[in-house]
Amino acid sequence: MDILKKSLFLILFLGVVSLSICEEEKRENEEEMEQDDEQSEMKRALWKEVLKNAGKAALNEINNLVQGGQ
């Protein structure tokens, strides 16, 4: 009977440890995904600003060429 109790305790303990490790990995993966999302949003905002400025510069150059030709 004593061996059975020890075996059950060992199985329970290993199950809890396994579950704990899985939860920790899941939490780490979620944190990584959140960081990736934040970085993606920052990159998107940066590209939006760069393209906006490039568009303004191109439009100004076209206006200068049109006005210079008249």
Swiss-Prot record:
Instruction: Could you list this entry's UniProt keywords, alphabetically sorted.
Output: Amidation, Amphibian defense peptide, Antibiotic, Antimicrobial, Fungicide, Immunity, Innate immunity, Membrane, Secreted, Signal, Target cell membrane, Target membrane
Predominantly, its location class is: secreted
Name one matching Pfam family. FSAP_sig_propep
Q: Which residues carry this modification: Glutamine amide?
A: Q67
Q: What's the domain of life for this entry?
A: Eukaryota
Q: Which residues form the propeptide?
A: 23-44, 68-70
Q: List the subcellular locations.
A: Secreted; Target cell membrane
Q: Which GO terms describe its cellular component?
A: extracellular region; membrane; other organism cell membrane
Please name the InterPro entries in this protein's record.
Frog_antimicrobial_propeptide, FSAP
According to its UniProt entry, the protein's GO biological process terms are: defense response to bacterium; defense response to fungus; innate immune response; killing of cells of another organism
Cleaved signal peptide residues = 1-22
> Where are the disulfide bridges?
none
Tissue expression notes: Expressed by the skin glands.
What does this chain do?
Antimicrobial peptide which inhibits the growth of Gram-negative (MIC=16-64 uM) and Gram-positive bacteria (MIC=32 uM), and pathogenic yeast Candida albicans (MIC=16 uM). Shows a broad-spectrum of anticancer activities against several cancer cell lines. Also shows slight cytotoxicity on human dermal microvascular endothelium cells (IC(50)=4.85 uM). Induces low hemolysis against horse erythrocytes.
User: Hey, which family's this protein in?
Assistant: Belongs to the frog skin active peptide (FSAP) family.
Any idea what this protein is called?
Dermaseptin-PH
